[in-house]
Protein backbone atom coordinates (compact mmCIF):
# COMPACT_ATOMS: atom_id res chain seq x y z
CA UNK A 1 0.00 0.00 0.00
CA UNK A 2 1.21 3.50 -0.81
CA UNK A 3 1.95 6.14 1.81
CA UNK A 4 0.25 9.21 0.37
CA UNK A 5 1.05 12.79 1.30
CA UNK A 6 0.16 16.39 0.54
CA UNK A 7 2.60 19.26 0.54
CA UNK A 8 1.58 22.88 1.09
CA UNK A 9 3.99 25.63 0.07
CA UNK A 10 2.87 28.88 1.74
CA UNK A 11 4.20 32.34 1.05
CA UNK A 12 1.98 35.07 2.46
CA UNK A 13 -1.55 34.52 1.14
CA UNK A 14 -0.35 32.21 -1.64
CA UNK A 15 -0.69 28.46 -1.10
CA UNK A 16 0.44 25.80 -3.56
CA UNK A 17 -0.96 22.33 -2.85
CA UNK A 18 0.91 19.27 -4.13
CA UNK A 19 0.09 15.57 -3.92
CA UNK A 20 2.53 12.67 -3.71
CA UNK A 21 1.16 9.15 -4.10
CA UNK A 22 4.04 7.02 -2.77
CA UNK A 23 6.68 7.14 -0.05
CA UNK A 24 5.10 10.02 1.86
CA UNK A 25 6.87 9.20 5.13
CA UNK A 26 9.76 11.25 6.55
CA UNK A 27 12.61 9.17 5.15
CA UNK A 28 10.94 9.19 1.71
CA UNK A 29 9.11 12.39 0.79
CA UNK A 30 10.51 14.24 3.82
CA UNK A 31 14.10 13.62 2.74
CA UNK A 32 13.30 14.47 -0.89
CA UNK A 33 11.63 17.74 0.15
CA UNK A 34 14.58 18.59 2.40
CA UNK A 35 17.06 17.95 -0.41
CA UNK A 36 15.09 19.94 -2.98
CA UNK A 37 14.75 22.91 -0.64
CA UNK A 38 18.41 22.84 0.41
CA UNK A 39 19.38 22.79 -3.28
CA UNK A 40 17.18 25.85 -3.87
CA UNK A 41 19.13 28.30 -1.71
CA UNK A 42 20.36 31.60 -3.06
CA UNK A 43 23.96 31.66 -4.21
CA UNK A 44 26.23 33.06 -1.54
CA UNK A 45 26.93 36.73 -2.10
CA UNK A 46 28.83 39.03 0.25
CA UNK A 47 25.88 41.39 0.85
CA UNK A 48 23.47 38.71 2.11
CA UNK A 49 23.14 38.11 5.84
CA UNK A 50 22.39 34.57 7.01
CA UNK A 51 22.49 33.17 3.49
CA UNK A 52 21.41 29.68 4.58
CA UNK A 53 18.04 31.10 5.62
CA UNK A 54 17.08 32.34 2.16
CA UNK A 55 15.69 30.15 -0.60
CA UNK A 56 14.42 30.58 -4.14
CA UNK A 57 10.76 29.55 -3.90
CA UNK A 58 10.40 29.32 -7.68
CA UNK A 59 13.39 26.98 -7.90
CA UNK A 60 12.03 24.81 -5.05
CA UNK A 61 8.59 24.49 -6.65
CA UNK A 62 10.12 23.83 -10.08
CA UNK A 63 12.31 21.02 -8.68
CA UNK A 64 9.23 19.31 -7.26
CA UNK A 65 7.09 19.67 -10.37
CA UNK A 66 9.83 18.41 -12.70
CA UNK A 67 9.56 15.06 -10.93
CA UNK A 68 6.65 13.91 -13.09
CA UNK A 69 6.10 10.64 -11.28
CA UNK A 70 6.35 12.04 -7.74
CA UNK A 71 4.38 15.30 -7.38
CA UNK A 72 1.40 16.96 -8.99
CA UNK A 73 -0.45 20.20 -8.29
CA UNK A 74 -3.82 19.51 -6.74
CA UNK A 75 -6.89 21.53 -5.78
CA UNK A 76 -7.93 19.48 -2.76
CA UNK A 77 -6.37 17.28 -0.10
CA UNK A 78 -5.99 13.60 -0.91
CA UNK A 79 -8.72 11.53 0.70
CA UNK A 80 -6.42 9.09 2.43
CA UNK A 81 -3.15 10.88 3.09
CA UNK A 82 -0.97 9.96 6.04
CA UNK A 83 1.43 12.91 5.95
CA UNK A 84 0.82 16.62 5.44
CA UNK A 85 3.96 18.72 4.97
CA UNK A 86 3.56 22.50 5.25
CA UNK A 87 6.47 24.73 4.23
CA UNK A 88 5.82 28.29 5.37
CA UNK A 89 7.95 31.11 4.00
CA UNK A 90 8.09 34.88 4.37
CA UNK A 91 9.08 37.23 1.60
CA UNK A 92 12.77 38.14 1.46
CA UNK A 93 12.52 40.72 -1.34
CA UNK A 94 14.93 43.65 -1.16
CA UNK A 95 15.48 44.57 -4.81
CA UNK A 96 14.98 43.16 -8.33
CA UNK A 97 17.51 40.34 -7.76
CA UNK A 98 15.24 38.97 -5.02
CA UNK A 99 11.90 38.43 -6.77
CA UNK A 100 11.69 34.81 -5.63
CA UNK A 101 13.79 35.05 -2.46
CA UNK A 102 12.05 33.83 0.67
CA UNK A 103 13.01 33.04 4.23
CA UNK A 104 11.90 29.77 5.81
CA UNK A 105 9.54 30.36 8.76
CA UNK A 106 8.70 26.74 9.53
CA UNK A 107 8.17 23.22 8.28
CA UNK A 108 5.25 21.40 9.83
CA UNK A 109 4.77 17.66 9.51
CA UNK A 110 1.27 16.51 10.40
CA UNK A 111 0.97 12.75 10.76
CA UNK A 112 -2.50 13.03 12.27
CA UNK A 113 -4.12 14.33 9.09
CA UNK A 114 -6.72 11.82 7.89
CA UNK A 115 -5.08 8.38 8.30
CA UNK A 116 -1.75 9.15 9.95
CA UNK A 117 -0.94 8.18 13.52
CA UNK A 118 2.19 10.09 14.44
CA UNK A 119 1.30 13.51 15.78
CA UNK A 120 2.27 16.99 14.63
CA UNK A 121 5.74 18.48 14.67
CA UNK A 122 6.98 21.92 13.69
CA UNK A 123 10.57 22.70 12.73
CA UNK A 124 12.05 26.21 12.57
CA UNK A 125 15.00 25.31 10.34
CA UNK A 126 16.06 22.91 7.64
CA UNK A 127 18.62 21.37 10.00
CA UNK A 128 15.91 20.62 12.62
CA UNK A 129 13.87 18.96 9.87
CA UNK A 130 16.89 16.86 8.84
CA UNK A 131 17.41 15.82 12.48
CA UNK A 132 13.82 14.52 12.59
CA UNK A 133 14.35 12.62 9.34
CA UNK A 134 17.55 11.07 10.70
CA UNK A 135 15.75 10.08 13.91
CA UNK A 136 12.96 8.41 11.90
CA UNK A 137 15.56 6.61 9.79
CA UNK A 138 17.23 5.20 12.93
CA UNK A 139 13.87 4.10 14.35
CA UNK A 140 13.13 2.19 11.14
CA UNK A 141 16.45 0.29 11.07
Located regions from the model:
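Cysteine protease-like catalytic core of ubiquitin/ubiquitin-like
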Residues: 29-34
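Short, solvent-exposed aromatic-acidic interface loops
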Residues: 17-28, 110-115
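Short beta-strand scaffold segments in enzyme catalytic cores
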Residues: 4-9
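Low-complexity intrinsically disordered segments
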Residues: 35-141
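Active-site beta-strand-loop-beta-strand hairpin of nuclease catalytic cores
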Residues: 11-15
Amino acid sequence: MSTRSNIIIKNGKTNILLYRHCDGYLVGAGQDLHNDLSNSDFEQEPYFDNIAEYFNIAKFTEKLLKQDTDYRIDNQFGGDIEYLYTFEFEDGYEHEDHYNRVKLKSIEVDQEHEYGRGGKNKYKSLSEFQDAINKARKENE
